[in-house]
Amino acid sequence: MNFPWDQLLVKGNWMITMAQIGAPFLVIGLIAVITYFKLWKYLYKEWFTSVDHKKIGLMYLICAVLMFVRGGIDALLLRTQLTIPDNTFLESNHYNEIFSTHGVIMIIFMAMPFVFGLWNVVVPLQIGARDVAFPVMNNISFWLFFVGMILFNLSFIIGGSPAAGWTNYAPLAGEFSPGPGVNYYLVAIQISGIGTLMTGINFFVTILRCKTPTMKFMQMPMFTVTTFITTLIVILAFPVFTVVLALMTFDRVFGTAFFTVADGGMPMLWANFFWVWGHPEVYIVILPAFGIYSEIIPTFARKRLFGHQSMVWATAGIAFLSFLVWVHHFFTMGNGALINSFFSISTMLIGVPTGVKLFNWLLTLYKGRITFESPMLFSLAFIPNFLLGGVTGVMLAMASADYQYHNTYFLVAHFHYTLVTGVVFACLAGLIFWYPKMMGYKLNEKLNAWCFWLFMIGFNVCFLPQFILGLDGMPRRLYTYMPSDGWWLLNVISTIGALLMAVGFLFLVVSIVYSHIKAPREATGDNWDGLGRTLEWSTASAIPPKYNFAITPDWNDYDTFVDMKEHGRHYLDNHNYKDIHMPNNTHTGVIMGIFMLLGGFFLIFETVIPAAICLVGILGSLVYQSFVQDHGYHIPASEVAENEARLREARIKEREAVGHES
C-alpha cells in the first residue's frame, strides 16, 4: 500500500509554515545539546529505562508542563481571533483545528499526566511503599502516554490537526473530515489511553497491596484515597473509550459503518459512548485535585482535616454518580422528558457530596492558624471560584433551562470555572507544594505569589464575561462574529484576562529557573517549616533514595506523622535494617514506544502493512518481556545504614542552622 505523500505537508497557513521550519531546528538543537554534554547514556540509564516511580513521575510532570504551554498558546490564539469582530487572524478551519487540539491537550495531555505525575511521586511515599506494584508496567505506561502526546502534536505540522472538536462527534468526524486529522485524534488518544488504563490498574494494586501493613483504608491520606477511587473510575471508564475509538478507526481506515447512518450505523452511539467515558473522565482529574486540596489546607491551617471519613464517602459518592450523568451533555438531542428528568436529577445529586467536601474544607480552616503560602492561596481561591462553577452546573442540569444555555459561551464559562479552578489551580498548588520533595528546595514564594494573583485575577477577567456572552446568545465554537452582535467589548475583556493568565504562568517559569539557581537546598524532607502531616515528609528530599523507606513505617491513625513529631519520634528510630530488594531498569518501554510511534504514524496515514509489522514488534516486545527472568537486585543493609546515617546527620545540621538563624 502506497504512502500518501501528498497529505504529508500542511500548506496555506503562515503559523504552520513557521512551525514546520522551526520544529526540525528545535529537534536538531536538542539532539546537539544532549550529544555535546554526553548525556545520552545518563538519560537512557537513569531516566528513560528507569522504573523508579519518582523519576517516572517527574517525566510525567515535565511533559504536562510542556503541554500546558502548548494548550495555553492555543487558547491565546483563540482569544486573539475573537477579540474583534470580522477578524481574519485565523481562518475558519484553522480555528476549528486549534480549539479541537486545545481541548484534547488540556484534558488528555496536560491534566491527566499532571495528576499521574503527582501520583507517581507522592502516593507510594504516602503509603510507606518502596515502589509501585508493577514497576515495568509503570515505565511502559509512561512511554505509551509519551508516544500519544508526540503523535497528537505532530499533527500540527504533518498531515493537519483534527478539526471536529475535542468530542469528535460523528458524522462530522467521519465522512465529513477527510485526511489524517481525525486519525491523529483516534490513534494518539488510543495509545495514550492504553497507558492510562495500565496506570489505573497499577495504582489500584499498589494501594491495595504495597501500603504499610498497619495502614487501614480509612486512615489513608486523602490524596491516596482519591487516587484509589479514581483508579476504579479509570478501570471502568477507559475500556469504553478504547472500544469506541477502535470502532471509529475501523470506520475511517477499513470502511466499516458503526457511525454512518446510510449504511445502518448510528452517530448517537458515538455521543453516548464518548460521554459514558467523558464525564467520568472529568472526575478522573477532579477527584485527585480534591485530594491535593485536602493535603494542602490542613497543612497550612495547622489542623487535622475536618470530617476525614465523610470526605472518603463523599469521594466514593461522586465517583458512583459520575457514571449516571452522561446524558446531560446532550439534553437537546431529543431524548424525551423521562430520560432527561432522570439525568437532570442525577446531575444535581452530585452537588450533595461535593458540598460535603466544601464544608469540610471550610471547617478545617475554622479556628486554624492559617498561613498564606502560595499552595494555600491557590487552595483558598479554589473554593469560591469552584462554587461558582458548581452553581452554574446545577443551572445547566435543569434540562428545560439547558435549551437556553446549551452550546453557548455560558457553558464554556461553566466548565472552565470547574476545570481550571478544580484541576489547574490544584496542579499548580500541588507542583509548588511537593516541589521541595522532588527537587530538594522550595520555589521562590514572592514569584509564586505573583503567579497566583495574576493567574487568578486573569482567570476571572477572562471567564466571567463569558457567562454574559452566553446569556446574550454567543454560540461556542464560533470563529468570528459581526459588529452588530454587540459582543466586542466583553470579548476584549476576556482576551485581556487570558493574557494576564499567561503572564502569571510565566512568573511560575521564572520561579522555577530562579529557584534552581538561588534557592538553598534542604535535607530534612519536612520542607514546609515542619508542617508536613503525611509520610512523604518523613523521607529525604530531592528524589529520596530508591528504596524510599529504610524500614517499613507504622501508621496507626490519619495523623500518625504529626503525633510522631509532637512526641519527638521518627520512623527510623528502629535501626534494624535489612537488605532491600529493588527492581532493575527495563528497556521494554522504550522499545514498545518506538514501535507504537511508527505503527501509529503509519495507521494514521492508513498505510496498513507497515502498521501491521509494527504491531508484530509490539506484541514481540511483550512476549519477550514475559520470558525475562529478572529478579532485580538487593541493596545491602550496610549500605542502607550508611545512607540513613548520612541523611540523619544532614537533617541535624540543617535543624541547627535553622535554630541559629531564628
Curated annotation (Swiss-Prot):
NCBIfam families: QoxB. Pfam families: COX1 (PF00115). The gene is qoxB. It catalyses: 2 a quinol + O2 = 2 a quinone + 2 H2O. It comes from Staphylococcus haemolyticus (strain JCSC1435). The lineage of its organism: Bacteria, Bacillati, Bacillota, Bacilli, Bacillales. Pathway: Energy metabolism; oxidative phosphorylation. Keywords: Cell membrane, Copper, Electron transport, Heme, Hydrogen ion transport, Ion transport, Iron, Membrane, Metal-binding, Oxidoreductase, Respiratory chain, Transmembrane, Transmembrane helix, Transport. Cu cation binds at residues 279, 283, 328-329. Catalyzes quinol oxidation with the concomitant reduction of oxygen to water. This is Probable quinol oxidase subunit 1. The keyword Nucleus does not apply. Its cofactor is Cu cation; ferriheme a.
